[in-house]
Amino acid sequence: PWRTYVNYNDPRLIKNYYPKMKEWFSYVDKYTVDGLLKRWPDTQYRDWFLGDWLAPIGVDAGAQSSVDLVNNCFISECLGTMEKIALMLGEKEEAEKFAMRRKNLNELIHQKFYHPGKGIYSTGSQLDMCYPMLVGAVPDSLYDDVKRKMMTDTEKQHKGHIAVGLVGVPILTEWAIRNREVDFLYQMLKKRDYPGYLYMIDNGATATWEYWSGERSRVHNCYNGIGTWFYQAIGGLRIDESIPGYQHVFIDPQIPKGLTWAKMAKDTPYGVIAVDWELTDNIM
């Protein structure tokens, strides 16, 4: 509902379902222990308490600590969205409650999952490192160290490859956009061997696969979260959430080394927004 509102300036879903959104948090509370969401008991839904999904071989996305971390970061992200929704609806007191709840949860995430001796969250995977940064669970004093550790380990442990699955792709992408780490992501996207998008293309892919390796479905709509990077980072187009529907936007291209031009266009409720930039003697 929030993304529909931001992209189309249509508040109907939010107004109709805000009570249900709040009700959903009662469900979350039912399975929260000491402030953190835990895997629910043996029910038919138990197996859907997932962390990352279909990560590359060698990434322990199924480790329980990683699964718990990812799910609690997701709750933090939802609380942030609920705060914005409440403010949009004029519910200031409820917005303050969501903000405080998120603050408390972020502190618990850091206390529970951060390993000071290793400088990592949970297993230290790309997702376990970038998701706490994205939702604000990493203290400011540690942020640069955590970022540096993730980027260094990406090179050392994964040979510079993307190392997330279906869940992690849009999270890593959004983190890279917000942090302006355009070279970090661009270098991963250029890798031609497994795992990566060029590996899919070089092996005959005409759509994204279910697995990075290509087993099972080869038309599965997985890993598509990377698409936003091309128009939000390379194209530089970011929406102004305070003025929804693309009525006001920010255009600030992030240019990785080796790229000299880009063109993009996006349909919006108020017309087509086009960006066309070219570097000449390092001047755009």
Specify the residue positions occupied by each region the protein language model found.
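Acidic-aromatic pocket-rim loops
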Residues: 57, 61, 157, 219, ...
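Structured segments of extracytoplasmic/periplasmic soluble domains
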Residues: 24-27, 31, 81, 85-88, ...
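Amphipathic, non-transmembrane alpha-helical secondary structure
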Residues: 2, 15, 22, 26, ...
